[in-house]
Amino acid sequence: PSIEAMAETYALADRDPDLATTISPYTNEPINRFLHIANSSEDLFMQNEMQRKLGQLTGTCFQRCVGMDAFNALHSVTYEIDEKYKTNYHDKFINFLTKMHEGNFVIGGAMTDVKGDRSKPPHQQADQDLYLRVVNRDDNGVYVSGAKAHQTGCINSHWMVVMPTLRLTENDKDYAIVGALPIETDGITYI
């Protein structure tokens, strides 16, 4: 059912573009509404209507909601971080989002860490790979290790956005990573 549900997110956009597509502010071309950043109450209403229709059509999870919600959150959070710290995360995010619009890609959201001993924060776990974390940084970027759970949506996606599953403290800064990677990246194992 997961493959058919994902396919329906594309099929609905073809059958009912008024419901399941909108115009990208970055490419000025139609995009799937799952890739759109909500800018108004009408956008939010249309997202909800599209999700309701897909629920009626599929009767199951259609696996694109976490990616859509992550993009909407990252749009504002990257801007706020840049305002406060004079970084350029928002521009990087917009460039990535534009690439996703151009390719009509599916974004899976990898949020749920496997957690281990839930009474302990990530940095106190006996196995550090029970939460996704940064293990190296260099001029090419960051390298992560760890596990995420319940990732059927990512298997059916083009890209996955990884993000923390809980509030973190300064001691857990290596676990405070949000990033995107193609689902076929070397080193990713799906079980």
Predicted regions and their residues:
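A short, Trp-centered hydrophobic/proline-enriched beta-strand micro-motif
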Residues: N104-D117
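Internal helix-loop-helix
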Residues: A11-I107
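N-terminal-proximal low-complexity accessory segments that begin disordered
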Residues: P1-L12
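Glycine-rich loop at the start of a catalytic domain that most often binds anionic cofactors/ligands
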Residues: I3, I31-A38, P122-Q125
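FAD-binding core of flavoproteins
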Residues: V114-I191
